[in-house]
Swiss-Prot record:
This is Uncharacterized protein encoded by LINC01600. It comes from Homo sapiens (Human). The gene is LINC01600. The lineage of its organism: Eukaryota, Metazoa, Chordata, Craniata, Vertebrata.
Length: 127
């Protein structure tokens, strides 16, 4: 199921720190936000700015959302490695699976084949 993007416009974004998402198993690291490594890339969501800080998605407490790659460390040692930030394509599994796609997002430090991130040729206008 793909949720409307409006669902995420009210998610509390934090600037200057890395946050892990919350899961039923406790605080589990999950890079809901990853940098776009392309200079001048446009943020996919309102409120995301060019920054040298790390942005992470803080999922709603009790949501039961668990990332498909629980081995991602937190906090990320690579915060600030890119010029612009946006949501990558990622999938949550659990009681309420969903996926979010954005424009050709290329994660900086999640490069293994097991990564939950996928490159998508979807423009911001698609939202």
């Amino acid at each position: 199921m793909i949720y409307p993007l409006d669902l995420f416009r009210n998610i509390p974004w934090k600037q200057g720190k890395c946050f892990a998402s919350l899961s039923p198993e406790g605080e589990r690291a999950f890079d809901g936000m990853e940098p776009l490594c392309q200079p001048g890339a446009r943020p996919a969501l309102r409120g995301l700015q060019h920054a040298s800080d790390c942005y992470r998605l803080l999922s709603p407490p009790g949501s039961g959302l668990v990332g498909t790659n629980p081995s991602v460390p937190a906090p990320s040692p690579h915060c600030g490695c890119c010029q612009a930030w946006s949501i990558s394509s990622f999938t949550f599994t659990g009681p309420t699976p969903f996926k979010i796609n954005s424009d050709q997002a290329t994660p900086c430090h999640l490069r293994s084949p097991e990564t939950i991130f996928r490159q998508r040729e979807i423009s911001n206008e698609a939202f």
